[in-house]
């Protein structure tokens, strides 16, 4: 499906707009650059992208956050972004560099970390914390495989007077992961 590339340094910026072809996305990757002395705006970016995805018809929408952590500069709470993420139907996937020595310092960073944690859990997404930016490429390759091999399962229960309390889904191979939204 269509893919877009959004930068989060200083403010959310569309680097490559939604396109089904890889050429525009590859060109956008060439325009990604560091923005020193500015805080990331992860909360705002997820909020904006989720709002845009809610207006689009998409079979399997996903938001992928690739971040080196650091200070959050959105200045807002996580709840609105979490609500919009739910309304969009998108899954949230996060790959982030985490330094073992880094601690959460301010409220905005705690808000971002809460959004990433709850967003992944609530949407059936995934999160991978890596210790160095050199691990981004293998982590993104794993995520690409995960996204490429997803299937939508629709379940309709038989008409009974008392509905079942739960639905159990199993896989023949233990290598399969099940996620639900």
Regions found by a protein language model. Give the residues of each.
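Conserved alpha/beta-hydrolase fold motif
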Residues: 3-5
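Exposed acidic/Ser/Thr-rich ligand/metal-binding surfaces
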Residues: 9-103, 114-117, 121, 125, ...
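Extended, alpha-helix-rich binding/interface surfaces that flank or overlap catalytic cores
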Residues: 108
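His/Asp/Glu-enriched short active-site or ligand-binding loop at hydrolase and phosphoryl-transfer sites
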Residues: 127-129
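C-terminal "exit" segments of structured domains
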Residues: 132-181
């Amino acid at each position: 499906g269509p893919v877009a590339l959004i930068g989060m340094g200083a403010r959310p910026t569309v680097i490559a707009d939604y396109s089904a072809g890889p050429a525009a996305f590859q060109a956008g990757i060439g325009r990604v650059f560091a923005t020193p002395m500015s805080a990331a705006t992860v909360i705002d970016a997820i909020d904006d992208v989720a709002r845009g995805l809610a207006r689009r018809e998409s079979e399997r929408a996903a938001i992928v956050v690739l971040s080196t952590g650091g200070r959050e500069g959105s200045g807002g709470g996580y709840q609105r972004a979490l609500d919009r993420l739910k309304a969009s139907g998108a899954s949230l996937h996060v790959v982030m560099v985490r330094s073992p020595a880094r601690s959460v310092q301010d409220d905005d960073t705690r808000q971002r970390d809460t959004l990433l944690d709850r967003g992944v859990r609530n949407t059936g997404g995934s999160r991978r914390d890596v210790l160095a930016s050199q691990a981004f490429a293998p982590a993104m390759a794993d995520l690409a495989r995960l996204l490429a091999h997803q299937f939508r399962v629709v379940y309709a229960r038989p008409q009974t007077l008392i509905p079942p309390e739960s639905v159990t889904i199993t896989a023949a191979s233990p290598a399969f992961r099940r996620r639900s939204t």
